[in-house]
Amino acid sequence: MPKHAQVKPHLLYEWDYEKGIIKPKNKRCPRCGSFMAHHLKPVPRWHCGKCGYTIFEK
């Protein structure tokens, strides 16, 4: 059994074949630059697992 789950690119990126652009679906962390996770419970927020930066939504 692998230690980590395989990354599924179709869940992380959006493709625009007409323009030839690939964009990430999630936000980037302003502090370290890695992808942020969107959590809905208990409070909606964006959180960076690498550096701990959190953005709370209103």
Swiss-Prot record:
Keywords: Metal-binding, Ribonucleoprotein, Ribosomal protein, Zinc, Zinc-finger. One of its GO terms (cellular component) is ribonucleoprotein complex. The keyword Ribonucleoprotein applies. GO terms for biological process: translation. A zinc finger (C4-type) spans 29-51. Coiled coil: none annotated. It holds the Pfam family Ribosomal_S27. Zn(2+) binds at residues 29, 32, 48, 51. Binds 1 zinc ion per subunit. Its cofactor is Zn(2+). One of its GO terms (molecular function) is structural constituent of ribosome. Part of the 30S ribosomal subunit. Belongs to the eukaryotic ribosomal protein eS31 family. This is Small ribosomal subunit protein eS31. The gene is rps27ae.
